[in-house]
Amino acid sequence: MLFRSAAFLINPGGDCHWAHSGDSRIYHYHNGKFMRKTLDHSYVQLLVKRGEITAEQANSHPQSNILMGCLGTETEPPVDVHFIPKLRTGDCLLACSDGVWHYFTDDEMGGVLERLSAREASEFLIDKARTRSQGGGDNLSLVVVKLEPLDS
């Protein structure tokens, strides 16, 4: 069995560390604006990196499900790490499986995360991914963390 992994940790000082392997992704938005995301450890991401196909073409590529590394294999998986110092009010982190991100653009997800609460955004993204996959999608897993101002 193969496992995809994406994880983030926010320490009490507000710093964020993330680690990623496979094709689950972590996205960082600030006030709905796309800031950064992880890159998949997949065959099509390798083709994108080489300039052989575009990111848009990768989404519909017939070999988009081939992973170059993930947890649960005999070889050591690739792990990418990233550090975000001092998250701020308006920052939002989304960790999700390919069954979610495959059906949205980065900007579309940012808009949903900006205008809805974390719970409402999670429900909307899951429901919309189910609809768009027409019953043929992958697993749907996600976690949303939004930094909102404290009530005074």
Task: Report the location of each language-model feature.
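ATP/adenylate-binding site constellation spanning eukaryotic-like Ser/Thr protein kinases
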Residues: S21, N31, D40, S64, ...
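Internal active-site segments that recognize and position negatively charged phosphoryl groups
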Residues: P12-H17, S21, Y27-H28, F34, ...
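Glycine-rich phosphate-binding loop plus the immediately following alpha-helix
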Residues: K33-L71
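Short hydrophobic alpha-helical segments used for membrane anchoring or interfacial signaling
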Residues: A7-P12, H28-Y29, V143-E148
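A generic local secondary-structure boundary/capping motif
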Residues: A6-A7, D15-H17, A55-A58, H82-P85, ...
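C-terminal catalytic subdomain
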Residues: N65, G69-C96, V100-S152
